[in-house]
Amino acid sequence: PSYNISGIEAAARCAGAEVAYVDRSRFRELPIPGGKAIKSWAFNDAFVLEDEVDVLINVPIAKHHSTSRLTMALKNVFGMVGWDRGRLHRDIHPKIADLNRVVRVDLTVLDAYRVLRRHGPTGGMLDDVDNSVDGARRIVISTDPVAVDSYGATLFGLEPGDIGFIKEAHDAGLGEMDYRLKGFEELTV
């Protein structure tokens, strides 16, 4: 898994965290309160039940996606759901917002150090990846995944409202689309 390859798993364990992987036996259907496009779905209960997890940290990477346009914090919760995820890709934007009504992430750390600009989500060639100072080399951290994705959209030259799932999640009250209202500050290290 990418956590092992990236060094995230070792660093998290060193800091005392329990690193959990998706256990297919723990999927169960849960209602989606206020769901617009889906009313229930199979979720991995280890990640969504409050008595199972103290803090849920989402560590997505910023990349192009052929169906949703981008995949970052909000889209990354697809890794915590079961059933036929292909069904989620039809009319995807409200479904991404609906899944985030159940999966409530405490902290998002968006890895935009290298950004996949084309041919996502899997990538095509090395030329599809940008790691320039102007277009990438960012780590975005927030308790608000909508704000994270809103800032992330700007790295692709897009406005947050250009991405359907960001607007859907904001309209559902899941976070702030204007990331500047969340006390955004850029640090150079």
Write out the residue ranges for each language-model feature.
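N-terminal and secondary-structure boundary signal
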Residues: 1-189
